[in-house]
Amino acid sequence: MNLNLYSTMRGVGARVQQAVASGLYSFATTPPEFAGGFLLESTGDAASPSGQENAPTSAMCVGEPGRIFASGYDSGEGGLSRFAEFEIPEIVAGTDMYARNLGARVQGYRNIDADFSLGSYATEEGTQTIGGMYYDPSTGRLHVGAYKYYDGDYNGQFNHYVYETASNLAGTRTGPLLVSASDDGASNRSAGFWGGQIIPLPAKWHTAFGGTHLIQNARRVAIASRASIGPDAGSITPSTIGSGGGIEKTLMRYTLANPLAAWEDSSSGSLVYLTNQLWNHLSNCAFAFVIPGTDTLCYVGHNLDKRLDSRGSNTIMYKGLNSEGAYADNDYAPYWADGHVGCYWLFDLNDLALTAADPVANPFYSHTPYEHGYIDVPVMAGNWRRNVWGGCFNHHTGQMILAVTRGAEPRFTNTVTSYEVFNLPGVTV
């Protein structure tokens, strides 16, 4: 496994890379090990005819042992507001898609636009995009975080939907709800900020953070000003959602005035996001989790591969032609066709606790990862259209599952996702 580690700086000076013994995990010293992968049943049903086909993202979470909830897509009616429950099949080593097992669908697709009677709110510009899911084993609930795909007028009203019994998605539901924060400085845009994934916290952090879990939505979305310009985190207690509970404390968020990229580049304007290694126009945090037995909050996604700088012209383009003459339609893309790479950002929960205790002295934009670098995902090699748009941590097995757009080619076309599994050496659950 080839990981490229960047040193990082924070306001108090250089951060020395820590080892597991100090309470922090290091991907540089213990790289993730590629274990193989699996696919999910790609066909749809009446609620989502396209199923896993054409799905440009895949928000997901593990439920009961051997089960996973994953979003799908239907281009005709509501886009990325669909999801279903699947079996996790036996993992097959290697990258031969024809050899991989298919996980059968065990509960049919649900459409949050329909399930929660969003009606005229779910217009084309208001289509709900699932940003994260969380199965709460203590309550049996399935939490679905979502945001409006395009919200140029910042009128998003809802971002959270609760299926009271995850094993019976057709049953009782609570919502639509707005999970927001009073201390994030952007109350009119909180729906976009917090329509994502809920993350369990170790019990020792509950008091310090004022919640039992974290919530984050650091996906790359349209209209950057309504998102965090870097990873984000707020504390929350899921059992209170639906009865007035919201974000207890904003712990990490980056604004346009204080982006994560500013920690390594003082350039002004948008040019910084063309080549910045911490955060740029390609940066995307697909999922996050606390690495068991450590104080490490890990974000995983994709980024621009700065190892290609020696070629020259290693930058990001918008609706342009890449090195192979392919047109990057309607989005940002790397100039080099193999310029996308898996990426991770590791943060110290002790730093976030400083913000929880004194947000004036330690603003939520004051954090930098103590380590970040690359995860080389074999199926992404050389293909600029493949990237990590989804994933989750399997708390039953201690493995990361990365969802790679178009990874199932050539067995399936139409952007069918592949699910790539990585072991974390030394991590036990």
Show where each model-derived region lies.
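Short glycine/acidic-enriched loop and turn motifs that connect beta-strands
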Residues: D74-G79, Y149-D153, L304-R307, G407-R411
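Beta-propeller blade signature
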Residues: L80-A99, Y154-S180, A224-P259, T315-A353, ...
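Blade-level signature of beta-propeller repeat domains, shared across WD40, Kelch, NHL, RCC1
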Residues: N387-V429
